[in-house]
């Protein structure tokens, strides 16, 4: 087995999440706001992970008490990430943009690392601590430089400041939900060590939550009905990217620590910025400070990979 298999899947997940966030922003701007990307991505996650499990996954173990404990914890993880985290995520990038949402959501490793220490007994190794320092130095650099140019940027902002503030709050809630989901997924695999089945269970649980809430929410009814309609190109790209990212993240958690996956996930911010600026052209091009931050963040990922190699 490849020594850094978990880290490689974590990098793939970060790229997929970054591309999905930028695609969602592009769809929001081209098609007048929010679409059905949240529920569509849940359906795609269930189909993708379930199909892979049937083709290459292990056989279903005997349905004893341990298996049901694992299933229950996977359900909680699905609600945290696929329902709460993803709803907050999609709406925040529509209100605040891919770059700012990605910046605020860098709190995910903080939530994940603290919870992993308490619930999983993980410890910060020297390599993890160095990687953590490099990545957060990168984030701090970008935050400081962004504050310096905030007034000029806000004067020309297309979105109202109230919407941007709402997007920032939702990004914070998304970070807390995703941080908790990392830990619950890893915890569930102590009883049911099958990442593909875990991704499928989480997606099905999330879909059930939407279906149960639909009679009480016109918005959820609209989203359920929208799944039956043909999605826009960018809705499909965004949902598929996020679904692939979530499945890859499950696999990463099977082979490495929560802390490592969370730290590597931080590079999503930098990947999203470069994709938004140079590939899909939905945001302004990052400046030299962002380039330096990107190098620091990648250095942190390299430190983690070398420590595991």
Predicted regions located by residue number:
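Loop-to-transmembrane alpha-helix entry segments
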Residues: 105, 116-152, 281-303
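Membrane-interface interhelical linkers
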Residues: 1-76, 86-96, 144-172, 204-243, ...
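Alpha-helical transmembrane segments of compact multi-pass small-molecule transporters, enriched
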Residues: 44-48, 104-119, 133, 205-209, ...
């Amino acid at each position: 087995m490849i020594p850094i298999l978990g880290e490689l899947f974590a990098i793939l997940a970060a790229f997929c999440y970054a591309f999905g966030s930028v695609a969602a922003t592009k769809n929001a701007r081209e098609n007048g706001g929010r679409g059905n990307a949240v529920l569509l991505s849940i359906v795609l996650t269930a189909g993708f992970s379930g199909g892979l499990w049937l083709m290459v996954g292990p056989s279903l173990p005997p349905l004893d008490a341990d298996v049901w404990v694992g299933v229950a914890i996977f359900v909680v993880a699905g609600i945290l990430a696929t329902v709460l985290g993803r709803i907050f995520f999609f709406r925040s990038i529509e209100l605040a943009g891919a770059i700012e949402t990605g910046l605020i959501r860098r709190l995910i490793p903080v939530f994940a690392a603290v919870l992993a220490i308490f619930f999983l007994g993980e410890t910060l190794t020297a390599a993890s601590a160095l990687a953590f320092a490099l990545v957060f130095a990168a984030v701090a650099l970008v935050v400081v430089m962004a504050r310096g140019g905030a007034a000029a940027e806000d004067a020309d902002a297309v979105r109202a400041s109230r919407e941007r503030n709402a997007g920032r709050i939702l990004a914070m809630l998304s970070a807390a939900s995703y941080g908790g989901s990392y830990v619950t997924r890893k915890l569930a695999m102590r009883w049911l060590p099958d990442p593909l089945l875990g991704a499928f269970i989480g997606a099905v649980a999330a879909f059930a939550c939407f279906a149960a809430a639909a009679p009480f929410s016109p918005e959820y009814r609209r989203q359920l009905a929208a799944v039956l309609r043909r999605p826009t190109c960018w809705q499909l790209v965004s949902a598929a990217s996020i679904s692939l990212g979530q499945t890859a993240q499950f696999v990463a958690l099977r082979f490495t620590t929560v802390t490592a996956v969370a730290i590597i996930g931080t590079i999503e911010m930098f990947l999203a910025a470069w994709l938004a600026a140079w590939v899909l052209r939905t945001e302004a091009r990052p400046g030299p400070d962002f380039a330096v931050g990107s190098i620091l963040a990648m250095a942190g990922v390299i430190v983690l990979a070398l420590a595991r190699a």
